[in-house]
Amino acid sequence: MKVVCMLLIIGVLMLGCGKICHHDHYGFKATAQFYPENDSIAVGDTIWFTSSVPVKNTDTISNQIINYGGASNFSTDINFNSIEDPLKISEIEGAIDSFSFISMVGSLKENPFEPKGSLAISYSEGSVYYQNLFAFVALKKGIYAVTVVDIENSYKRCAKAYVSLTLSNINKHQEFLKITYYPGSPFGDTIPEIEQTHTYCFKVY
């Protein structure tokens, strides 16, 4: 009986020695880029997408440097759409079938929730950066908008991070978006702020 009691006491003590799981929330900033930065390309030409997120990053909430290595669900979506006058079409069309894709770093797959207009990308973790790199080759003529979505829910044990991904391109060729956004357009008179920082446009001829 004494042995059983001792084992129970030891078990309780061991459970009590476990680390407390802090439900921390972090906000990080990072960039993505499309290159070469041409406003027009020919069918058969290639555009590259690259994004690097530091493993050790400054938390926008606490302003402290956080080591966020070993995180899970470090992934997001990239949306591909044709740019057309909304008054001349019934809905915005996805443009995944206008390109062929080559994944180089990280992973790239069809987004099951939006298979015609979106790809799901996952970052590969290195010692310094989480990275994703892929190429896409133009197959069809048209005017296109590619929008990078922020990483919204990346987890590390009990912690959760939101990563704001803005484009570092000097020229995002957003004059093409005026085809969609103009006075009287059902989508609005002006280009939304989120698209100003997250959308890259180009023409395929």
Language model regions located:
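Residue-level recognition of well-ordered beta-strand positions that form the cores
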Residues: 50-54, 79, 147-149, 203
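Start-of-domain marker
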Residues: 18-77
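Sec-dependent signal peptide recognition
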Residues: 2-9
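C-terminal motif of bacterial Sec signal peptides marking the signal peptidase cleavage site
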Residues: 13-16
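Glycine-rich, aromatic-bearing surface loops/beta-hairpins
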Residues: 133-134, 144-205
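Structured domain cores in non-transmembrane regions
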Residues: 57-142
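Short structured motifs
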Residues: 33-37, 114-120, 130-133, 185-187, ...
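A short, structured loop/turn motif at beta-sheet edges
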Residues: 39-45, 137-144
